[in-house]
Amino acid sequence: MVINDFTNTNFVILAHLYNEKNNENVIKTTQDEVADKLQLSRVTINKAFSLFVQNGYLQRDLKHVGRYYLTDLGCTVVENIRTLSVEVNMLSQKSLIK
């Protein structure tokens, strides 16, 4: 994993996909729907999806056009970044209290 893969925008997109996945990690939301929901351009979403597929965070569903699976790696990345964010916020609050 390359940290540059996770600019704020890319992480927002991947986290949104994480929230949209079903219990089999299937994402039925289209790129257009993601763009509308996140108020981002279709080009931005398409570039992010391509990056995520290239790096193993998403996998295309070969049976259904436009459908993707969030891989175990993609899930782990979102969970780890969320955990790290909580820990950093807690440390920041502790340093403000001192």
Model-derived segments and spans:
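Short amphipathic alpha-helical interaction segments
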Residues: N8, Q39-Q54
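Minor-groove-contacting beta-hairpin "wing" of winged helix-turn-helix DNA-binding domains
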Residues: H64-D72
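Amphipathic alpha-helical dimerization/coiled-coil segments
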Residues: R82-K98
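Short alpha-helical segments that sit at the start of domains
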Residues: M1-H16
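A short alpha-helical element within helix-turn-helix/winged-helix DNA-binding domains
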Residues: I27-K37
